[in-house]
């Protein structure tokens, strides 16, 4: 069902989003004031990204992670979890680690690599790959760093014993020798992507983030054979930002909340659809196209405050205030209609470094309202 037409202008939607999203202290230079800047700050962005980079498709792993978390995808029939099973907040089930930010970071090294010469004694060239980590905030804690390599084999058949992959810290200057080897692993075949876990090898779990990660790679056949060519390198980085992770956060419900219509009536959630196209962010927000933010509106007078109006029961304090207001209107104000149940959303977008980022934001959707 297409989203309903909205009356508020884009500026009002930006202001609403800026109020909904958490305000995070950044260590970088302050951004200009205003609703748009406040929302960009909450998204962890210094400036508004320019849009999707040319010839930069969204990696399939990022689509899979997003679709598993998006409630619209699960309701449309592409459910990746069993009915009744809820996703643990601030946890990436597919990778088995804690986290609420997933980045797919491409290699910023040489854009093209020439074919490698044949090797008669296992001596093959090395490659240097560079990953830009400048967008990672100091408060983020790494939980997984997976190097993924795709090779174009010069020979159809794998050498006897396969290949050996070695990863070392690359030297900083031109012609500088690489540092000590961080890891070695056997690669039996080059058809599927070659993956190597770097966390604990490239840097310690509690170490400060480098601005970039430079690695020297070598793939040597264990028997005389032609060398392979490195076609693509990327880093899948999962981090946990505790500022965006609520210990008591509730998972998103599968069913849509019961929403009210007009402004009158009892306290309940009212429908509000926020479109990223309306605010001009569709060029760099990959998915979703928008989301139901909703808002609370309605009366909390008796008997609504006693019944809970179909939502959660009102607090005893709210009932007491409603009783006092009914007996003596000047003695106490009516309770307020406020969110009683909130749920998160996941946003897939390009950041300022053209990385594909999947980020979860808590308390973005009003599911239920109550008198407080």
Curated annotation (Swiss-Prot):
<feature type="disulfide bond">
    <location>
        <begin position="267"/>
        <end position="337"/>
    </location>
</feature>
<keyword id="KW-0339">Growth factor</keyword>
<dbReference type="InterPro" id="IPR017948">
    <property type="entry name" value="TGFb_CS"/>
</dbReference>
<protein>
    <recommendedName>
        <fullName>Embryonic growth/differentiation factor 1</fullName>
    </recommendedName>
</protein>
<keyword id="KW-0732">Signal</keyword>
<feature type="disulfide bond">
    <location>
        <begin position="296"/>
        <end position="369"/>
    </location>
</feature>
<feature type="glycosylation site" description="N-linked (GlcNAc...) asparagine">
    <location>
        <position position="206"/>
    </location>
</feature>
<feature type="region of interest" description="Disordered">
    <location>
        <begin position="67"/>
        <end position="86"/>
    </location>
</feature>
<comment type="similarity">
    <text>Belongs to the TGF-beta family.</text>
</comment>
<comment type="subunit">
    <text>Homodimer; disulfide-linked.</text>
</comment>
<feature type="propeptide">
    <location>
        <begin position="30"/>
        <end position="253"/>
    </location>
</feature>
<feature type="disulfide bond">
    <location>
        <begin position="300"/>
        <end position="371"/>
    </location>
</feature>
<dbReference type="InterPro" id="IPR029034">
    <property type="entry name" value="Cystine-knot_cytokine"/>
</dbReference>
<dbReference type="GO" id="GO:0008083">
    <property type="term" value="F:growth factor activity"/>
</dbReference>
<keyword id="KW-0202">Cytokine</keyword>
<dbReference type="Pfam" id="PF00019">
    <property type="entry name" value="TGF_beta"/>
</dbReference>
<keyword id="KW-0964">Secreted</keyword>
<dbReference type="GO" id="GO:0005125">
    <property type="term" value="F:cytokine activity"/>
</dbReference>
<dbReference type="GO" id="GO:0001701">
    <property type="term" value="P:in utero embryonic development"/>
</dbReference>
<feature type="signal peptide">
    <location>
        <begin position="1"/>
        <end position="29"/>
    </location>
</feature>
<comment type="function">
    <text>May mediate cell differentiation events during embryonic development.</text>
</comment>
<keyword id="KW-1015">Disulfide bond</keyword>
<dbReference type="GO" id="GO:0005615">
    <property type="term" value="C:extracellular space"/>
</dbReference>
<keyword id="KW-0165">Cleavage on pair of basic residues</keyword>
<dbReference type="InterPro" id="IPR001839">
    <property type="entry name" value="TGF-b_C"/>
</dbReference>
<keyword id="KW-0325">Glycoprotein</keyword>
<keyword id="KW-0225">Disease variant</keyword>
<dbReference type="InterPro" id="IPR015615">
    <property type="entry name" value="TGF-beta-rel"/>
</dbReference>
<dbReference type="GO" id="GO:0007498">
    <property type="term" value="P:mesoderm development"/>
</dbReference>
<dbReference type="GO" id="GO:0007492">
    <property type="term" value="P:endoderm development"/>
</dbReference>
